[in-house]
A protein has these predicted regions:
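Beta-rich ligand-binding surfaces for carbohydrates and other polyanions
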Residues: 2-373
């Protein structure tokens, strides 16, 4: 037993010294045990099962090491129902599969090229990759972003980020960020047509006569349009709004012994934000919101949900219900309002008319292209 422990310790130390830890075919994780993830060499990133709301999901996250909450970076099959506590994840020749006691095996991460998987790694870049027997990457999570990109990751032309439904539900939410073929970076409500009338923010990065461009968040937290052919920087994208915690981040950054990981996320509220995650020497990390696309969140179409309106005071958005309605959930004011009275029908066009009235509200700006129901 002592020899086995020593060998495991030796493997762990060698893994940390390398740029990746190789996960062999047949390796598995179980949600019912303490081994629920595979970590990167630095242990800053992990891939495996994570808890969210009332279920389990498979994804990649920044590991808070028990000192801070984990920051989820990517979720696999985000719109599928969550797994139960008896799920098992395994790497085999077709990729990563997940099985449970209540359903048959399913392919969770497939190889688009139908190449045979041979091994996998959770890299220190935050990229989970699958290799073939020639050690070539045949699948990587960086090519399938959900709502976040990391420093060193790119968003290709006509690709998108989609916000999560809520902080406790990683399924697709209400907004998406598109890297359009014309080079522009644009925010739209997800359930509307992508057109100039429905867009609520754009980076003004139109490009003419230049193809093969991608949006890249570099390792120092700068968003850039990159030429995919020669990796040259075509244009830098600036998020104009400086967040309140920006000055705190600058103070923290002055300590050179701390390492920083940058991320850019389309958050639940529809705003696109740049974050810095500063790792502490004793483990864990501190997250700072640095910049965002919009100063006024009320400009985000549908920010307050159905039957409600948004006001912006003291640099903060506030949602309020239209007369005759109350919040669907008082603890989540952004999901909208519902009628607070019993419906009365106007039979023959006359009955119950006294129960209805039309009320005018002053100072309301109707947002073109988004219809309340």
């Amino acid at each position: 037993m002592a020899l086995l422990s020593a060998l495991l310790l030796l493997f762990s130390s060698l893994c940390v010294q390398q740029s990746s830890c190789i996960i062999p075919l047949g390796a598995s994780l179980s949600s019912a045990t303490q081994t629920t993830s595979w970590t990167s060499p630095s242990r800053r990133f992990a891939f495996g099962f994570y808890n969210r709301g009332n279920g389990l999901y498979v994804g990649v996250w920044l590991d808070g090491n028990g000192k801070k909450a984990n920051k989820v970076i990517w979720t696999a099959k985000r719109d599928d129902r969550p797994f139960t506590s008896d799920a098992t994840l395994k790497l085999n020749e077709i990729g990563v599969i997940v099985s449970t006691a209540e359903c048959r095996e399913m392919i969770f991460i497939a190889n688009e090229n139908h190449s045979d998987a041979y091994s996998a790694s959770m890299l220190d870049s935050g990229n989970f990759v699958i290799y073939n027997k020639d050690n070539h990457i045949i699948w990587e999570s960086f090519q399938h972003p959900t709502d976040t990109i990391l420093g060193g990751q790119s968003l290709l032309a006509n690709s998108q980020l989609i916000s999560s439904l809520s902080e406790n539900d990683p399924s697709a939410g209400m907004y998406h960020l598109r890297r359009q073929n014309d080079g522009n970076l644009v925010l739209y409500p997800l359930e509307s047509e992508d057109s100039p009338t429905t867009a609520y923010w754009k980076a003004e990065t139109y490009v003419t006569n230049v193809a093969n461009l991608s949006l890249r968040l570099n390792s120092t937290g700068v968003l850039q349009l990159i030429n995919n052919i020669d990796s040259s920087v075509y244009r830098t994208i600036h998020l104009s709004n400086q967040e309140e915690s920006y000055s705190d981040f600058n103070e923290s950054r002055s300590n050179n012994s701390k390492s920083i990981v940058y991320s850019a996320s389309l958050d639940v509220d529809g705003n696109f934000r740049l974050y810095a995650h500063v790792f502490e020497p004793n483990g864990g990390f501190q997250t700072y919101a640095m910049r965002s696309a919009l100063v006024n969140s009320c400009k985000i179409k549908g920010f307050c949900g159905f039957n409600s309106y948004c006001t912006f005071n003291d640099n903060r958005p506030f949602c309020a219900c239209l007369p005759g309605t109350d919040f669907i959930d008082p603890n989540q004011n952004t999901i909208g309002c519902k009628r607070n009275y019993s419906e009365a029908h106007c039979k023959g066009g006359k009955a119950n008319i006294p129960l209805y009235n039309i009320t005018s509200m002053q100072g309301i700006e109707w947002t073109t292209g988004y219809i309340l129901q």
